[in-house]
Amino acid sequence: MKIGFDNDKYLKMQSEHIRERIGQFGNKLYLEFGGKLFDDYHASRVLPGFEPDSKLRMLMQLSDQAEIVIVISANDIDKNKVRGDLGITYDEDVLRLMDEFTSRGLYVGSVFITQYSGQESADLFKKRLEKLGIRVYKLYLIPGYPSNTSFIVSDEGYGKNDYIETTRPLVVITAPGPGSGKMATCLSQLYHEYKRGVKAGYAKFETFPIWNLPLKHPVNLAYEAATADLNDVNMIDPFHLEAYGKTTVNYNRDVEVFPVVQAMFEKIMGSCPYKSPTDMGVNMAGNCIVDDEVCQEASRQEIIRRYYKSMNALVSGSGTENEVRKIELLLQQAHAEITDRKVVPAALEKEKATNGPAAAMELPDGKIVCGKTSDLLGASAALLLNALKELAGIDHELHVISPDAIHPIQQLKTKYLGSRNPRLHIDEILIALSMSAATSDAARLALEQIPNLRGCQAHTSVMLSDVDVISFRKLGVELTCEAKAEKKKEYQKV
């Protein structure tokens, strides 16, 4: 992989900048962490060299000063909202985040339930956390939020919210996903702190858009593609341009809400410490790009992947035409085409040649391998075996799993487990491969190559079953699929 981002420089520069911001506010700073605090795979894809846990590692350098508050919306609890990248609900992710933070030596002070209006599911979640010894606080729905600043910044507004008791100079506000109420949490806390005579401050840590890259830079366009469902739009920060005469990039929600935030700061603090949304940020990522062309190309590839994801969502009923059209426009702005993703034409050509669903994968050395549908294997399972053989230097004509070993598994699926699809999925072929590895050197060599699949690109000529999608995700393979089902059915399950 070509490197475009200096991760070590980023860790050092980012932690130093946050320390400076803490010092500007009398040693008490509420830091809103946008995006993912760890598992930031989007950043690692568009900034090659950025580690998915970079922000967490940076925070660990501040561990003696920091405590974490995890925010979750009562509405998201009520709707059982799911993290698309992990396939778990937001409330389960709160517990996962707590485990991850504490296992790294970071202090999690409490959980804050926002947008609370008596939801029974939120009450049950609160009780569940309290039984685990976790402190839980609530932020209530405020009428007229966010425009009625006089009411919001009063004892009847923020004053009704619980006050989170914190003990450290840096309070990191994070959440399972966007729209959880992180900024509202920070402002509510500032209100309570000033009531108590503590002159705390607020800052925002948002990796994207990168404020000191051009508006239409592919890295920033890739962020728009990633948030197409939220209808976020990158724009020039007009407040920063007016205050300093300098062009910087922010996104529409922060720009639109800034006059309101500014008014709230003035009511809470007496004056607003910031002249623009850009001023509120502490992100140093743009200063750590060491090869701009590498990051541009990685971002163009990300937009293509997001396009396929939006098309799949549209076909399955969970996406919208607007989302697809927006990403099509972003592809044009980034001067990218779907055929720039090498595995796309390879998979489609294989489908045409075999007259059945097919798949292709680009290996770390750039070589493309393909898989086709057969009586024994689905295209994805065949692709996986072919990729492992290629990585291990095994002749493609050699069976690493005997067909005689596959037939009993097919019989188990169809005769005893009620499946109508006899072909093996990825997880099933991996189990068969691991069993064969006990007696076959070739199978063992193939199995040992599994870690080398991480980061590989794959494309299939049809949409896959959930079981194969999840398997690719677990293997770390970046998957895209054509937006069509293998067979036209009202109810798709294989």
Q: What are the residue ranges of the model-derived segments?
A:
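The conserved Walker
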Residues: 177-178
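Active-site pocket-lining segment
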Residues: 399-419
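Hydrophobic positions on the alpha1 helix immediately C-terminal to the Walker A/P-loop
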Residues: 185
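Flexible, solvent-exposed loop/hinge segments and secondary-structure transition points
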Residues: 392-393, 414
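A short, polar/charged loop-to-alpha-helix boundary motif
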Residues: 376-392
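Flexible phosphate-sensing "switch/lid" loops adjacent to ATP/NTP-binding sites
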Residues: 1-173, 189-350, 356, 363-365, ...
